[in-house]
Amino acid sequence: MTYSKEIVREWLDQVAERAKEYPEWVDVFERCYTDTLDNTVEILEDGSTFVLTGDIPAMWLRDSTAQLRPYLHVAKRDPRLRQTIAGLVKRQMTLILKDPYANSFNIEENWKGHHETDHTDLNGWIWERKYEVDSLCYPLQLAYLLWKETGETSQFDETFVTATKEILHLWTVEQDHNNSPYRFVRNTDRKEDTLVNDGFGPDFAVTGMTWSAFRPSDDCCQYSYLIPSNMFAVVVLGYVQEIFAALNLADSESIIADAKRLQAEIQEGIENYAYTTNSKGEKIYAFEVDGLGNASIMDDPNVPSLLAAPYLGYCAIDDEVYQATRRTILSPENPYFYEGKYASGLGSSHTFYRYIWPIALSIQGLTTNDKAEKKQLLDQLVACDGGTGVMHESFHVDDPTKYSREWFSWANMMFCELVLDYLDIR
């Protein structure tokens, strides 16, 4: 059993009581919250935890963290759930050591996934080998939050230490992608699924930031320095320093020194290269830059995103540059911002035209101090569930019954986070 049904039921009843004015929210919340626990989580023979992303039979390092993060509230009082989350960290770190460039993995070494179409250094554990900086940020975030929220430290084992070293090494190598062994080519007509220049990626100059091949949408980067992911890296490198200083883990001194250096260099790169101006002449963050003078003004609905910067802990909600960036990306100046009959929000190159993502609507609510805006977004999310009672990857702004992905656990859990945030359960 991955959790105590009695403890979780008691907690759900407490949430329902707090939200009794909003029965529609409660209905969707309970369905989403229990579905992830009951249908995506599996405890493996070694005690580690595998978390299915939903309707794709694989585990993403990013998604799995986001899927279990809302359970940290209950994990304080449920030892089984606490061990389930610690088991996920252990599985994530083990898989990172199988290949730190991969974004998603199989439950066993079964060679399932994109092996027939992809030209890259694959092994049987890998479902897909699209290198995304955030895939390495998320497991560090979960390990840290589990410790801070519950006091759990069993996740900080020898594998965690070794994987942390590997992450620091990879991010350092990718500060100059010319030194990288990573290449990725897919046999496809969809240009977003492969890298240009024979799998090397687009042209760039060294900036101090760390290079990324793909976005958290699993679409390739137009320019190779993805600003939201570098922001996230700065945050989790601070977590690494705090963990190793407080718990005196193996090789603490060298790991702290490497994390501190890398954090400073990436932050300096952000400060030197990440800014641009919007159509009003306001200073904003670019979404991607290449160090050669090119920058994109847009945002993607997946997390990390520019919209999510305060949610990730990179800046305050009232930060002036963030607010200018927020206004820009929630406007037609962002080519992936769509407005329609039922909703408005962020879409993606990964999905159809005029389809927006519930994940981004949840993040919009989690990054405002305006209670009325949070309520409006929650009402919108529930009204746009396509009659299914759960969230989806995306839906059409003029017809929510048109949506992508029947079962997308990450979106379900982001909705749950926004409900808890609205109820001041943090």
Regions found by a protein language model. Give the residues of each.
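C-terminal capping/lid segments that line or modulate ligand- or cofactor-binding pockets
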Residues: 118-124, 129-132, 296-316, 354-426
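Active-site-adjacent bridging/hinge elements
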Residues: 36-46, 110-118, 203-215, 336, ...
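Aromatic-rich carbohydrate-recognition surfaces in CAZymes
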Residues: 57-85, 89-191, 409-425
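Extended ligand-binding clefts on enzyme/binding-domain cores
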Residues: 97-101, 108, 168-234, 247-249, ...
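Well-ordered alpha-helical scaffold segments within catalytic/enzyme domains
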Residues: 7-21, 66-79, 138-153, 231-251, ...
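Low-complexity, Ser/Thr/Pro/Gly-enriched N-terminal "stalk/linker" regions
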Residues: 1-62
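Extended, well-ordered alpha-helical scaffold segments
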Residues: 28, 79-95, 152-172, 240-243, ...
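Short, solvent-exposed segments of well-ordered alpha helices
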Residues: 51-58, 123-130, 134, 158, ...
